[in-house]
Amino acid sequence: MNFREHSASSAVSDLQFTCEPNTVGGFTLIPAAAPGLCIELSCSAGRLFPRENQYDVDMQYQTEVDNETAGLDTHFCPYDLRFTLPAHSSTEISLLCTVHPVQDTPVLSRPQADTAAIEIAHVQEYYDSLKQQAGYGDDAFANTLVVAADQFLARRDSTGLMTILAGLPWFTDWGRDTMIAFSGLTLATRRFSDAREILSTFAQYVHHGMVPNMFPDDGQDPLYNTADASLWYFYAVDAYLKVTGQPSDYDYIQQRIYPVLREIIHAYAHGTDFSIYMDDDALIHAGSGLDQVTWMDVRVGDWVATPRHGKPVEINALWYNALCVTAELAEHFKEDSSVYRKLATRVSASFRKEFWNEKDGCLYDVIEENGKDASIRPNQIYAVSLPHTMLTAEQALQVVNTVEEKLLAGPGIRSLSPEHKDYHGIYCGSLPKRDAAYHQGTAWGFLMGGFLTAYMKVHHHSPEAKKQAMAYLAPVQTHLLEEGCIGSISEIFDGDAPHTCRGCYA
C-alpha cells in the first residue's frame, strides 16, 4: 500500500496509517497525511496475519532510475493474506478495495467469491454501452479507442459540468489539450451532451478573450498563459455543429458560445495578455520574455527550451480558421460577417507571403522580429489539416510530404527534424535532459491526427490514401494493444527508433 503523489517517493516516515481489521475479511486504513480519507480492503476468503515487518523498503523503479534519480520507494504492508487450497485445485476469490471520505463510510458486507467478477461484468456492460452508442460495430481498434476515451472525461466541481483531462496520472484539464481532443473524445464517440457541457465549462472561464491554459490541481484560479487554446476553441465549436447540426444546437451556440467567440476575436485583434496581438499585417504575434504561450512551452527557471516568440505558424493558421468559423456563424445567424471575411482575406495574403519557405518547400515555424525560423517542425501541418486553410494545393502537398519524410516516427510525429543541430532523439535522463528533448525531437502521439487529416485532404480521400493512412496507424494500434499502459496511447515517444513510449502513460 502506498499513499503519495504520482511521481514522489515514500519513506517509512511518510507512510503512517491507522490500521485495523474490519468485519468484511480485510482491513481499514486511514492515512495520517489525509485523516479524512478511508481505504477499505475486503476479501471473500482467507485470513489476515499481522506482519512483523510492515514496510517493504528500497523498492527500485526502473523508470525513475532511467531519469537519474535513486528510484527507491517504500510500501506499507500490514498483513499477509493467506488461503488454504487443496492440492491440484483452483478456486475463485474476490478482493475489493474502496476509497471514500471517512464520514461516508459505506455499509459493507464480506464479498462473495464471485463479487469481483460481478463488478467487472458491470463495468464491461458500461463499456459495451459506450461501444454501442459510438456505432463502430465489430471494429476492435475503434472500440478500444472508445473505451480509452472514457477515462479522460471528468466532471469539474467548480462548474458542475464535464471537462477533459489532458493525461493520466498527472495532467489536469488543459484548455489546448481539451479542444484538440474534443472531437475524438466526444463527437466520434457520440457523447454530444458531454460535448456541450465541455464547451460551456470553458466558456465560463474566458478572461480577456482567453480560454484557460490549465486548471491547477489545488483548485486555485486557472492560468491563461496560452495563445492557442482560445483559437482551438473555434475548431471545437465548428466540429460540434458539423456533427450535431440540429436547430437546438445552433440555438445553444448562438446564446451561450457565439458571444464568447466574438469576444475572443476582438481581444486578439486589439491585443490581450502575454503579448498576444494582431500586427499591422493582420497576423497574430504571441509571447515575449520568459512567457511560453504555444504548446512548445518548456521553461525551467530563466531557461526557455524552445522560444517561439513572434508569429508562430500554427497560431496564425488557427487565427484564420477562427475568423472563417465566426463569419460562417454570423451568416447563419443572419448577422453581418463582412468584418470577419475582410480580416480573413488580409490574414491569408500575409500568411502566404510571410510563411512560405520556397527553399525547403514547406512553412517557416515562426516569423520573428529578426528573421524567420526555418526549423522543420510539425506545427505547419495545421495549415493543411484545419477546415479553413490558405495554401495552394501544391503548397499543401509539399507541407505534408515534408512532415511525412522528416517527422513521421512510428506512432507519433517528431517535434523537430533529425537534421536539425538541436535534435534530441531520446527522451531520458535527468529533468533538464528530458526538458531539452521534450519539444526538440521527441515524437508526440496527438500530432498523428493532424498529419493524417492533412494527408487525406491532399490526396483527395482516395482509396489508396486511406490504405496508406491505415498503414501509418498500424504502429499506433500495436502500441495501444501491446505496449506501455495497455489500452491507452502514451503522451510521447523517442524520436529515434524503436520509438520507446515515454511521458504520461495515457
Feature locations, PLM:
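Acidic, mature catalytic/reactive cores of soluble proteins
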Residues: M1-A506
